[in-house]
């Protein structure tokens, strides 16, 4: 069984750092004006390249969102954005507009294509159509039940990705016009004002009767992985880095069988709307799915809790185990080779080694120095060391 991907949101470089150092396999973020979270910090220009390089140096993939509807008058800007993304070396594009799909195929034909949840494709026929169009992955709607997800996984010709934690819209993603009608800020243009979180009342309701609790299916990740989900997505490009770190940590723990009530409590404290819901997944629709941000939800993230997750991502995480080969011979330049995965680098000294004057340079000392990888993406694996020149002085030769 292929290991399922942990896909984390990155609305800022600090959030991206939190995702990567907490153990995400991939991150997703927007660039420019053509993504569903235009109010996030996002990445553009040099920041885009810096973000992609940061991730790739740590063996983390980058999925970039171009998941809004684009006007004809914006085609020049769109093409420039696609060229910039293609040049950056990003791994995949998440798309909504089929017109954007055509532009991407013309400019960057080799990049992987993912169908955004904004496309509202939740049927097998729809997924097969996406495959025919060239998509290699579809992001499933949040509104599907576990039986529907299982059926799609068993029959889909392409990879399937699903949200396992984060906000739920009152409407199906990609189909809502409420924000556009009430304030001329369209969700399909990346500018949703979230009017469903405002006080709308129905008879015998809560006073916030369009506001759903956040989804949380992290505890079901092992089951969903066996079902065939390829990627578990965390919503939250507008959330703080500590939230990202906590969600990635919880998901990682779940997939390794170490998920606990502490993970759930931490997530609820960092952000919730009166708790979480599994309503759609369990096909248990009803009033318990609704909730809003009450005062205790806003103030529950204590300084100690924030610091707990800040500590996780403030230090560099070792990704590569390095094998060293060191050769010190009297008639050759010193050679040091470092190998990790499929990469190998060899450096040579500028001159031949000189005999030690005060003390010998031993294998033990060389090993001690090679093990100093702290604060980098590397960790010491093992070493083959050959040192033939050990004597401190001529006097040592006489002993």
Question: Where in the sequence are the language-model features?
Answer:
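Surface-exposed amphipathic alpha-helical tracts and adjacent flexible/coil segments at the periphery
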Residues: 1-22, 26-37, 51-52, 58-86, ...
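Aromatic- and glycine-enriched glycan-recognition loops and surfaces
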Residues: 40-49
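Residues at the C-termini of beta-strands that transition into short coil/loop
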Residues: 117
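Beta/alpha (TIM)-barrel catalytic core signal, keyed to glycine-rich beta->alpha loops juxtaposed to Asp/Glu
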Residues: 120
């Amino acid at each position: 069984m292929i290991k399922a991907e942990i896909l984390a949101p990155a609305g800022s470089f600090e959030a991206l750092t939190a995702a990567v150092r907490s153990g995400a396999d991939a991150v997703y973020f927007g660039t420019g004006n053509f993504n569903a979270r235009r109010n996030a910090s996002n990445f553009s220009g040099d920041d885009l390249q810096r973000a992609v390089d940061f991730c790739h140096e740590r063996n983390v993939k980058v999925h970039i969102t171009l998941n809004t509807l684009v006007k004809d008058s914006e085609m020049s800007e769109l093409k420039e954005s696609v060229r910039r993304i293609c040049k950056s070396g990003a791994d995949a594009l998440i798309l909504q507009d089929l017109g954007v799909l055509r532009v991407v195929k013309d400019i960057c034909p080799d990049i992987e294509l993912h169908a955004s949840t904004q496309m509202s494709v939740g049927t097998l026929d729809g997924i097969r159509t996406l495959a025919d169009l060239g998509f290699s992955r579809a992001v499933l709607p949040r509104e599907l039940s576990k039986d529907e997800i299982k059926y799609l996984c068993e029959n889909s010709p392409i990879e399937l990705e699903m949200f396992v934690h984060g906000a739920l819209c009152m409407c199906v993603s990609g189909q809502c016009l409420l924000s556009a009608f009430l304030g001329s800020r369209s969700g399909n243009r990346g500018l949703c004002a979230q009017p469903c979180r405002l006080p709308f009342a129905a008879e015998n309701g809560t006073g916030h009767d369009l506001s759903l609790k956040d989804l949380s299916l992290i505890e079901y990740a092992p089951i969903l992985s066996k079902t065939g989900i390829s990627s578990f997505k965390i919503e939250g490009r507008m959330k703080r880095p500590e939230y990202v770190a906590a969600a990635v940590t919880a998901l990682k723990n779940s997939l390794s069988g170490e998920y606990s009530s502490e993970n759930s409590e931490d997530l609820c404290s960092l952000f919730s709307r009166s708790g979480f819901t599994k309503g759609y997944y369990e096909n248990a629709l009803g009033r318990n799915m609704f909730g809003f941000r009450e005062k205790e939800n806003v103030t529950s993230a204590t300084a100690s809790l924030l610091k707990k997750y800040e500590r996780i991502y403030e230090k560099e995480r070792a990704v590569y185990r390095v094998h060293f080969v060191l050769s010190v011979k009297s008639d050759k330049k010193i050679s040091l080779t470092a190998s990790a995965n499929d990469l190998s680098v060899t450096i040579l000294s500028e001159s031949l080694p000189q005999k030690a004057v005060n003390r010998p340079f031993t294998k033990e000392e060389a090993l001690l120095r090679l093990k100093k990888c702290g604060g980098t993406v590397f960790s010491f694996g093992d070493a083959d060391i050959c040192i033939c020149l050990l004597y401190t002085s001529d006097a040592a030769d006489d002993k």
